[in-house]
Structures are given as C-alpha cells and as structure tokens.
C-alpha cells in the first residue's frame, strides 16, 4: 500500500506520524521499550497532545534483532496470524548514553539516535541498512485532525522503509507472478496460505 504522492507529499487524506525522539526508555537485559512521541518535546505543554508510539526491541535469537512498533495496545487483534517459536526472554546487550541506545545480539547491532530519531542496523561495525525521518511511521487515512478524529471510516497502518545501497536487490516476498527482483514494487503481505483451489492462490500482486 502506498501512502505518498511522490517523495514530498502524502496522498490526500493521509497523515503521517513518525517518531522524533526517545522521550523515555525502559530497559533490562532482554528488552528495550521506548516511548517515542511524533513531535519534539520542548516543555511540558508539548506532552498534552499528539501521538506517541511504543517501540519494543528484543533479540529472539543470536544475530537477530526484532523491532515492534505499536500505538494504543490493548485492543483485541482479529488479524490472521500464527504463534512464533522464539525465546521472548533471551538476553541481549544493551547500552544507553545521553544521545544513543545500542542493542547487540551476536554480531548484529542496532543503534538508535534518541534526540533526532533514527535507527541503524550494523554487523561487525558495517552499516547494513538504516531508517530515519518518516521511514518508520504510524499512518492514518481520511485524517481530519485531532479535534475530529472520530471518523469510523478512517484506518490506521504501520509503515517501515529501510534503505538499500546501489546494486542491492530484494527477492522473494511470496510466490507471485511478476519479476523475481522486487525493487520498486509495492507488495502486500499476509499470513494466509492460499490452497490449490481457492480464489487466493498465488495470483495476488
């Protein structure tokens, strides 16, 4: 699903809420939970409105870092999904400074800039990919402003974009008709498995 109208504009009725800073951080040896407001907090009046995102970082396996972003947890989830076989309490290395948070799992690390939000994924000191600006965002459709945010037709989505280098390619994303290399494509992903005689099959593109 595409939310943008080119690089600089959102589609009509779309509003983007991206984390701007880490307002406070709760951490232990198996998770980091960050409150990330979508606007900078200069004084306590800035805490009275706006949207906050909760970002949870864990390491379910060595060399793996999982980042989960949510807004308003607690609502029953009816989406199709399956349980994952992973260790929710696996220990990881966490270090926090005044400006950054470092999470390490094996030779993979995640560097988070707390003051001007950005995330950099690195292996053995080499940057693999990164996101900043509006790359990670909570998106609203049919947005009419905070004062009128009661539209039952409006929907919410989470969006994540990760940078890739020249000559890097994205493969797979399910069995679908089309080019094997997915660069530049918009691809829907779901957990349903179309059978041999269902209308889903592998025709979705």
Describe each PLM feature range.
Residues 1-4, 15, 47-49, 70-72, ...:
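Catalytic and substrate-binding clefts that recognize carbohydrates or anionic sugar/phosphate headgroups
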Residues 3-43, 49-99:
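A low-complexity, Ser/Thr/Gly/Pro-enriched, surface-exposed linker/loop concept
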